[in-house]
């Protein structure tokens, strides 16, 4: 029964390649949080509040690891805008409940009967989810646990993140032996949630970007010394880099760990000498105060680093090449769920080798696995923020216009479906149910490409977020509905994603109503 529970895969702390804090760094904040996790007389909620790049997720990973080692971790959910389910508020409580049920048999005994009679709990209100999936089983089982929720600001539901905090405020007092550790940027919707009277009184707030700069700089200096020593050893460089250069890199980081980490990734190149790349970093423009003193502002230095990496990778200005760059990098940034290079190539109608070569040239900004079947993701959420802001990404070759790129992705999805979908492409026997086909997954893997799977499940999402000229899209939609609709439903059924068909059609109707409003009647028909 538990395995049939709809939940977010890969959301727990032990999944993925997240790293915890380097030993000896972030000691003040870690000590405060860990003291809180062990004292159940203290507030039941802890909000680690910090700007982008200040290291919230790394700290959350460390807290989860330490809580697990201490036998206190009940469950964890690391939100990510890169994945549909991990960026949805409605998957948080079901996923936490699944983990709690596997850890605590007494919790499982109270949860399973409820799931048997309520299999669609993911579609219910957040209040019902928390009350039935979390609070009641925890209270009845009398469990003591710490629950970690990282990057709440990355949830992108229609309802604001404050909705889940409102639910937490009303119910958390019913489970006094359970603590919630939450991280997130200080965005208005999250700040609003934590200002609710019930939650405000129950929350310990730690503002990460208010830590004394000397403490942060010392931690970044320790990190740089450790990582660059390892890098120098791998590249057989003696006496490199100098202490002065490490100090300058620390200064340029301006308190942002993401700057230091990205710099190390940039220096550790397979195709360039680290010494040469370090010279590039140290020659990046500096800003000065009115008194003429050098100063480094966090976002300015990070933007300068991102832009320099991109400009070093793509030195020639060619409109045709620039279009390919935008298409590939924009796909990495805006896909609903990340794809491997082959899937990106399929949607963009490009050679997969061309995609791999381009992505490899900026791998310091990405999570790019040597295994070509693994999805490509931005290394840090601040990179998509940079690319999609025209005031920050001042080189128009790299600026990603969300609406235009979503339109391009919608066209790519519809084109792939119109070109590739065929009825009974999985060669099912007549009237066979999915459960009758023993090798169903093998047929899906061999006959439905990664790009086609993505297109079938996500075309409507890109369509509703698109902007631009839609005439060509109308013809693609017409072809899809007239000729490929049944084949699309077959694929969704094989992917166990038929719920998505209703959502897709509802979004399509709403989108058509919106874009056709004001058109001549004959045209809109």
Placement of each model-derived feature along the sequence:
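Extended alpha-helical scaffolding segments used for macromolecular assembly and cargo binding
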Residues: 412-481, 487
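Conserved NB-ARC/NACHT P-loop NTPase core of NLR-like innate immune receptors
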Residues: 1-410, 425-427, 437-446, 477-482, ...
């Amino acid at each position: 029964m538990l395995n049939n529970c709809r939940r977010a895969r890969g959301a727990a702390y032990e999944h993925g390649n997240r790293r915890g804090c380097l030993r000896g760094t972030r000691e003040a904040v870690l000590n405060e949080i860990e003291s809180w996790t062990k004292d159940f007389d203290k507030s039941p909620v802890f909000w680690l509040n910090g700007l982008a790049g200040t290291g919230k997720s790394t700290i959350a990973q460390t807290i989860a690891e330490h809580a697990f080692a201490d036998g206190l971790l009940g469950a964890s959910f690391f939100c990510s805008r890169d994945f549909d389910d991990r960026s949805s508020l409605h998957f948080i409580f079901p996923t936490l409940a699944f983990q709690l049920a596997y850890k605590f048999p007494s919790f499982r005994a109270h949860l399973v009967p409820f799931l048997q009679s309520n299999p669609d709990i993911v579609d219910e209100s957040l209040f019902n989810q928390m009350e039935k999936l979390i609070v009641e089983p925890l209270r009845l089982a009398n469990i003591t646990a710490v629950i970690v929720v990282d990057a709440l600001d990355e949830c992108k539901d229609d309802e604001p993140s404050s909705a889940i905090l409102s639910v937490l405020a009303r119910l958390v007092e019913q489970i006094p032996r359970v603590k919630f550790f939450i991280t997130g940027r200080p965005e208005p919707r999250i700040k609003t949630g934590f200002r609710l009277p019930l939650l405000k009184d129950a929350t310990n707030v730690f503002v990460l970007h208010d830590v004394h700069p000397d403490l942060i700089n010392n931690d970044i200096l320790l990190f740089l010394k450790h990582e660059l020593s390892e890098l120098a050893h791998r590249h057989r460089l003696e006496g490199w880099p100098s202490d002065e250069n490490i100090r300058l890199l620390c200064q340029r980081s301006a308190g942002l760990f993401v700057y230091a980490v990205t710099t190390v990734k940039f220096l550790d190149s397979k195709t360039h000498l680290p010494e040469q790349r370090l010279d590039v970093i140290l020659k990046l423009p500096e800003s000065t105060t009115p008194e003429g003193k050098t100063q480094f502002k966090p976002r300015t230095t990070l933007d300068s680093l991102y832009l320099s990496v991109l400009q070093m990778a793509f030195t020639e200005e060619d409109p045709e090449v620039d279009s390919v760059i935008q298409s590939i990098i924009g796909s990495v940034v805006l896909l609903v769920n990340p794809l491997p290079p082959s899937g990106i190539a399929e949607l963009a109608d490009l050679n997969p080798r061309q995609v791999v070569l381009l992505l490899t040239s900026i791998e310091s900004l990405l999570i790019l696995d040597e295994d070509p079947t693994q999805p490509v993701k931005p290394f840090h959420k601040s990179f998509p923020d940079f690319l999609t802001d025209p005031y920050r990404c001042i080189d128009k070759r790299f600026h990603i216009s969300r609406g235009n790129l979503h339109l391009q992705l919608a066209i790519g999805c519809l084109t792939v479906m119109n070109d590739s979908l065929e009825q009974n492409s999985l060669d099912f026997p007549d009237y066979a149910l999915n459960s009758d086909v023993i090798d169903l997954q093998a047929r899906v893997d061999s006959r439905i490409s990664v790009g086609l799977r993505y297109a079938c499940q996500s075309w409507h999402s890109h369509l509703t977020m698109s902007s631009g000229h839609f005439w060509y899209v109308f013809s693609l939609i017409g072809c899809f509905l007239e000729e490929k609709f049944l084949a699309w439903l077959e694929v969704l059924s094989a992917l166990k994603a038929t719920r998505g068909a209703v959502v897709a059609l509802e979004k399509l109707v709403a989108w058509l109503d919106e874009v056709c409003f004001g058109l001549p009647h004959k045209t809109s028909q």
